[in-house]
Curated annotation (Swiss-Prot):
It comes from Balaenoptera musculus. This is NADH-ubiquinone oxidoreductase chain 6. One of its GO terms (biological process) is mitochondrial respiratory chain complex I assembly. The chain crosses the membrane at residues 1-21, 25-45, 47-67, 88-108, 149-169. Signal peptide: none annotated. PANTHER family: NADH UBIQUINONE OXIDOREDUCTASE SUBUNIT ND6, NADH-UBIQUINONE OXIDOREDUCTASE CHAIN 6. Gene3D superfamilies: NADH-ubiquinone/plastoquinone oxidoreductase chain 6, subunit NuoJ. The keyword Metal-binding does not apply. The gene is MT-ND6. It is a multi-pass membrane protein. It comes from the Eukaryota.
Length: 175
């Protein structure tokens, strides 16, 4: 059940960044980043990293709220452009949603996406401990699993941060 919750949060994460990449107005771009950050924190929390998820939520989203609050105040429009006001932007948004939907359908029909994520064989992530004060720390094991099994997660996270910086530079640059 948790696997499917993470799967749904990952879908929300990707769809929010599709919305960011086809942003018509800074308000909606910031909203997409906030939703994507919240979904990413939900994924971190579902794997037991409560402290890490809380820190990401407080620091990353707090900083984003300040930046996007400032840029929204500087670029306020009386009638902000929405996704349906420009046919090219709407087409890019719908194309991204269709591609994401096809990936989801493929993953649900085959049971796995071989490159990124498998729905079976997650026993490697389980920490076998007898209880009490164990030898293994959950956070350290999570970091080891992130860099061994989650190499694609690290790549996607780095790419997302790069795209976020480019979008922030584009928003603050102006006309």
């Amino acid at each position: 059940m948790v696997t499917y919750i993470v799967f749904v949060l990952s879908i929300i994460f990707v769809i929010s960044f599709v919305g960011v990449s086809s942003k018509p107005s800074p308000i909606y771009g910031g909203l997409g980043l906030i939703v994507g950050g919240g979904a990413g924190c939900g994924v971190v929390l579902s794997f037991g990293g409560s402290f890490l998820g809380l820190m990401v939520f407080l620091i990353y989203l707090g900083g984003m709220l300040v930046v996007f609050g400032y840029t929204t105040a500087m670029a306020t429009e009386q009638y902000p452009e929405v996704w349906v006001s420009n046919k090219v932007v709407l087409g890019a948004f719908i194309l991204g949603l269709v591609v994401e939907s096809l990936i989801v359908i493929y993953a649900l029909k085959s049971g796995e996406v071989k490159i990124v994520f498998e729905f079976d064989g997650l026993g490697d992530w389980v920490i076998y401990d007898t209880g009490g004060s164990g030898v293994f720390s959950e956070e350290a094991t999570g970091i080891a699993a992130l860099y061994s099994y989650g190499v694609w997660l690290v790549i996607v996270t780095g790419w997302s941060l790069f795209v976020s910086v480019v979008i922030i530079m584009e928003i603050t640059r102006g006309n």
